[in-house]
From Swiss-Prot:
It catalyses: 2 a 1,2-diacyl-sn-glycero-3-phospho-(1'-sn-glycerol) = a cardiolipin + glycerol. Residues 218-245, 392-419 form the PLD phosphodiesterase domain. One of its GO terms (biological process) is cardiolipin biosynthetic process. Catalyzes the reversible phosphatidyl group transfer from one phosphatidylglycerol molecule to another to form cardiolipin (CL) (diphosphatidylglycerol) and glycerol. NCBIfam families: bac_cardiolipin (TIGR04265). This is Cardiolipin synthase A. SUPFAM superfamilies: Phospholipase D/nuclease (SSF56024). The lineage of its organism: Bacteria, Pseudomonadati, Pseudomonadota, Gammaproteobacteria, Pseudomonadales. Keywords: Cell inner membrane, Cell membrane, Lipid biosynthesis, Lipid metabolism, Membrane, Phospholipid biosynthesis, Phospholipid metabolism, Repeat, Transferase, Transmembrane, Transmembrane helix. SMART domains: PLDc. GO terms for molecular function: cardiolipin synthase activity.
Length: 479
């Protein structure tokens, strides 16, 4: 023991470096981006005592167990679908393909796993009051089934309003299925969930529970926000369930966010997306409901669900294709701006094509490191000719894309690596001049309350701030 004692720290350091080597090899083999693989490999090789635990938490970017679960869910869903009247849905897909507007989507229908469908009705919901009033009213009118999925649910005033409403509808015999993300809703008390379960509400948490190492994972979060009522009415967007989304929690108040209400055949795609996630959490299917007929007119919509289990990097490619499709303008709003090389190159090329490229970001940070990295990318974008704005009144959380005068997308995906490759996201694409005009007017009102970043601002930034932003960018592949 006298010999062993003085050398124990040497043995521990050697062991850590050995484990760091193993982890570095794993990073090279599994991390999706070259930047991320290099960043992890170098840090694990040279500083394993600082990076091994963060790698367990943030590092892995594959989720094989989910792929298998999704395939199994798809088989089960096809069995259920065969028992439904699915013909109107097929007809709507054929109608969409025959329309002139379909061509404007370019590669989107092939990129997403869902078809583009005609004859939908959409309604823009600006901010939390309008969003939750519409959602709660729809749930109150439900008769058959309600599917609810949020990244965050808080046990606060808004969360308890939702709980009371679900208890009321469950008592009436409505089938309620509630899915929340275990990490996003980490503060949700067990008593909140148990009260719902005792009343007959089906509640499950989405969690990466496959394997011992996944117990440490915070990647692969389910960031989707979906509500479907009786298979007829759907909601998707950026809001979660919490008082802050109603603008009731300074210093980020007032909270700026956007949702969209949709009815028509694309609601079937919302149900399918929910069913895949529900099957992963519960190993069973929720009720899938389709109406016998749909309206004879409406707008083209496509649901784009993305996640780390996809064969392609669907979310990143969506932004690339959207930017490349623009001939007149591309306006994007996001709380975070950490683009990968492909997205940033697409933005620069759009500027060279004389496209009006604008990005709207929050002026107030909710995550300091992410804000620092976003600021550096914002300065670089401004130097490339992109117009970047900071929304002043409060925190901007909406995720909206407007392409030219026809295509808009609203959903949960941020303009960052976590949405591109690590989270499960959903966006609703709408092809319609009138709805695009509504989105345009909404964004123009937001730009009117924003301050445009000038080119000289990056040079006026203090050197310590510049250093902090560059350090933040080094770890941006894992933010």
């Amino acid at each position: 023991m006298d010999y062993f004692g003085p050398h124990i720290f040497g043995y521990l350091i050697a062991l850590l470096h050995f484990l760091g080597l193993i982890a570095a090899i794993h990073a090279v083999l599994t991390v999706r981006t070259a930047q991320g693989a290099i960043a992890w490999a170098l840090s694990l090789l040279f500083m394993p005592y600082l990076t091994l635990i963060p790698y367990l938490v943030f590092g892995r970017s594959t989720f094989d167990a989910y792929i298998q679960a999704r395939r199994q869910a798809n088989v089960e869903m096809h069995k259920a679908i065969n028992e439904l009247n699915w013909r109107p849905w097929v007809e709507e897909a054929l109608t969409a393909r025959a329309s002139k507007a379909y061509a404007s989507l370019r590669a989107m229908p092939k990129l997403g796993r869902m078809p583009c469908l005609a004859n939908n009705q959409v309604r823009l919901l600006v901010n939390g009051d309008a969003t939750f009033e519409a959602i709660f009213n729809a749930i109150r009118r439900s008769h058959k089934a309600v599917l609810i999925q949020f990244f965050i649910i808080h046990d606060d005033d808004l969360g308890r309003r939702l709980q009371r409403l679900l208890l009321e509808k469950a008592a009436e015999g409505v089938s309620i299925h509630l899915l929340y993300d275990r990490i996003g809703s980490h503060s949700l008390p067990a008593s909140y969930v148990q009260t719902l379960r005792d009343a007959g509400v089906q509640v499950h948490a989405f969690a990466t529970r496959s394997g011992w190492l996944n117990r440490f994972q915070v990647n692969f979060r389910n960031h989707r926000k979906i509500v479907v009522v009786d298979g007829m009415l759907g909601f998707v967007g950026g809001h979660n369930v919490g008082d802050e989304y109603l603008g009731k929690k300074p210093p980020l108040a007032p909270w700026r966010d956007t949702h969209v209400q949709v009815s028509g055949p694309v609601v079937a795609c919302l149900q399918e997306s929910f069913a895949e996630d529900w099957f992963w959490a519960a190993r069973e299917l929720p009720p899938l409901i389709l109406p016998d007929t749909y309206p004879d007119d409406g707008v083209l919509c496509q649901l784009l669900a993305s996640g780390p289990a996809d064969a392609y990097e669907t979310c990143s490619l969506f932004f690339v294709e959207a930017i490349h499709a623009a001939t007149e303008r591309v306006w994007i709003t996001s709380p975070y701006f950490i683009p990968d090389e492909a997205v940033f190159a697409a933005l620069r090329l759009a500027v060279l094509r004389d496209v009006d490229v604008r990005i709207l970001l929050p002026a107030r940070p909710d995550h300091r490191i992410v804000y620092a990295a976003s600021s550096l990318y914002a300065f670089e974008a401004v130097r490339a000719g992109v117009r970047v704005f900071r929304y002043q009144p409060g925190f901007l959380h909406q995720k909206v894309v407007l392409i030219d005068n026809e295509i808009s997308a609203i959903g949960s995906a941020n303009l960052d690596n976590r949405s591109f490759r690590l989270n499960f996201e959903v966006m609703l694409l709408t092809v319609d001049d009138d709805f695009a005009t509504e989105v345009e007017h909404m964004l123009e009102a937001d730009f009117a309350k924003a301050r445009e970043i000038a080119k000289e601002e990056s040079r006026q930034t203090h050197r310590l701030q510049q250093l902090g932003m560059r350090v933040a960018r080094l770890i941006s592949p894992i933010l």
